[in-house]
Amino acid sequence: MGSEMCIRDSGKVAIKIHTGEKNGPNILPREMVMALQQHVPDSNLVETNTFYKGDRYTTAGHRETLKVNGWDFCTVDIMDEEGAVMLPVKGGKHFQEMSIAKNMLNYDSMIVLTHFKGHTMGGFGGSMKNIAIGNADGRIGKAMLHTSDPSNPWEYSQERFMENMAESAKATTDFFGKQIIYINVLRNMSVDCDCAGLAAAPPTTPDIGILASTDILAVDQASIDLVFALPDAAKHDLQERIESRRGLRQLSYMKELSMGNDQYELITICLLYTSDAADE
């Protein structure tokens, strides 16, 4: 999925990560994230608080989790610390606007750095899920996208949840326009999200590599295609999780919303990564 880097040479850059719960065994390596961040001028890691009550429900608890998990080598902006704003959802059938973390508007560009894996509700978590849930604020936006019934914020249908996520993500993609890039890291692919922390199921799918694109649909589609192309024994658990949750609706609905292209070309780039890279 070859494309030129779209991030501006000047301006503030948000690197959207997923904190995960404390001591999660499958989160992205600290050294990998540090190596990227240190090569992007004027960049911060960015996150938002959770909808469910846990260690990341409050900003104070979230910052403690960030410290435990090693995300303390640079500034981390909890983007909904100061509230939320409503951004338009162009072409949405469920939402006309979405409640997004207020501080996202302070950035000129975004790098969506995603640990691709399974997800209990969404089937899988790729770039779209990272910004759909991850840029919505913890109190209003996440409640909006988790429900099809406003009176019951945990009542949802699986297909509606996928569509809600895509529309939430579209608020972010429309805001940044061409100033956004997506990186999916296909390693330690448990069937569970990093929200599961130590309770996450051990990965049974082998590591594949890293995908990058300026097209959100292409990068998630390619990630799914690479997983589904694995031998049956290697892909079984993750594919079952994705299909049983109707996770592929994420892709088809992004296409309906004209968020990207599900046709792509894979261009292989061989890079040697070592833990020393962050020190260079």
Regions found by a protein language model. Name each.
Residues S3, R8-K12, I17-M34, H39, ...:
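Extended, low-polarity segments enriched in aliphatic/aromatic residues
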Residues D276-E280:
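A short, hydrophobic C-terminal helix/tail in secreted or cell-surface proteins
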